[in-house]
């Protein structure tokens, strides 16, 4: 049976890209999916049965490597986390929240800071470039871009080949503008910042995977849920690469790096090996997880 990847889901139809035959098949789901409570997602690898050259039925959904609830997409290889230098203001707390979420899902993060052309005063630019160095030192890929000038895009595009990539980030940071600059044929709608609220309006309605630069890219509505619902206390440290690396030297196994004695992570913070603001965010997120209502 032929196989392909679902690149769009709309009104009960699933559009399957069969690269071996270089065509897209419009498929319906079978009742067995509803019976087994399986919802096919954009990004799923699917086995299908063709009725003709253009239409068919989904028969099976292959096992997923990961699955995001919002946006509903699966088998994501990497996420370009788009944050603006200004309008809205750059936030390391929000960036770290996104990083934790993608790391927890086994997705490779790429950080993109856009609108650098709007950070007019030298102090703002200097502060942001300092953060860029911090995140690069941790091991993250970080790119500084200006969508209007099309600068800094080459570095991001080189990551797309043979990958499924999502763009995510705070509303109003220019995700659609950035994708339009990368692939002008997308013609994705963009909205200016709402002057009343100081934040952007979501302009993307549904998730669709689009061929560009040798890979598949989704312009998503961003993560509308930023809660750590699937992350347990003992798992949080593994989503901070620098904590994950140093925690092996903690005296106690299962150290949460809070009040435990002889904690290598706390020592690394004191000695400047781990940025204090990253550790503060770790503690904030840990508290959030601890206060989460028990799940039954």
Curated annotation (Swiss-Prot):
Its EC number is 3.6.1.-. GTP binds at residues 114-117, 169-177. It holds the Pfam family RsgA_N. The keyword S-adenosyl-L-methionine does not apply. The lineage of its organism: Bacteria, Bacillati, Bacillota, Bacilli, Bacillales. The keyword Transcription does not apply. It is an enzyme of class 3 (hydrolase). This is Small ribosomal subunit biogenesis GTPase RsgA. HAMAP family: GTPase_RsgA. GO terms for cellular component: cytoplasm. Zn(2+) binds at residues 250, 255, 257, 263. Keywords: Cytoplasm, GTP-binding, Hydrolase, Metal-binding, Nucleotide-binding, Ribosome biogenesis, RNA-binding, rRNA-binding, Zinc. GO terms for biological process: ribosomal small subunit biogenesis. One of several proteins that assist in the late maturation steps of the functional core of the 30S ribosomal subunit. Helps release RbfA from mature subunits. May play a role in the assembly of ribosomal proteins into the subunit. Circularly permuted GTPase that catalyzes slow GTP hydrolysis, GTPase activity is stimulated by the 30S ribosomal subunit. One of its GO terms (molecular function) is GTP binding. Residues 65-226 form the CP-type G domain. Belongs to the TRAFAC class YlqF/YawG GTPase family. RsgA subfamily. Binds 1 zinc ion per subunit. Monomer. Associates with 30S ribosomal subunit, binds 16S rRNA.
């Amino acid at each position: 049976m032929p196989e392909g990847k679902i690149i769009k889901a709309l009104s009960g139809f699933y559009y399957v890209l069969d690269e071996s035959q270089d065509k897209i098949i419009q498929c319906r789901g079978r009742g067995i999916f509803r019976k087994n409570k399986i919802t096919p997602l954009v990004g799923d690898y699917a086995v299908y049965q063709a009725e003709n050259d253009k239409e068919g039925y989904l028969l099976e959904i292959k096992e997923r490597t990961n699955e995001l609830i919002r946006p509903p997409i699966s088998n994501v290889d990497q996420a370009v986390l788009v944050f603006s230098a200004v309008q809205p203001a750059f936030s390391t707390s929000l960036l770290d929240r996104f990083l934790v979420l993608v790391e927890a899902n086994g997705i490779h993060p790429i950080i993109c800071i856009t609108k650098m052309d709007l950070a007019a005063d030298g102090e703002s630019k200097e502060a942001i470039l300092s953060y860029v160095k911090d995140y690069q030192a941790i091991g993250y890929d970080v790119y500084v871009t200006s969508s209007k000038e099309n600068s800094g895009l080459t570095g991001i595009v080189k990551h797309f080949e043979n990958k499924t990539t999502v763009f995510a980030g705070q509303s109003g940071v220019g995700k659609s503008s950035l994708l339009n600059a990368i692939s002008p044929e997308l013609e994705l709608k963009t909205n200016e910042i709402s002057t009343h609220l100081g934040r952007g309006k979501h302009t993307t309605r549904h998730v669709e995977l689009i061929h560009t630069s040798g890979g598949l890219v989704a312009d998503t509505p961003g993560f509308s849920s930023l809660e750590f619902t699937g992350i347990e206390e003992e798992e949080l440290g593994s989503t901070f690469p620098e904590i994950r690396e140093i925690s092996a030297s903690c005296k106690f196994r299962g150290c949460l790096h809070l009040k435990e004695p002889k904690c290598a992570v706390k020592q690394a913070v004191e000695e400047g090996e781990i940025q204090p603001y990253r550790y503060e965010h770790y503690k904030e997120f840990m508290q959030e997880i601890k206060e989460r209502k028990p799940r039954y």
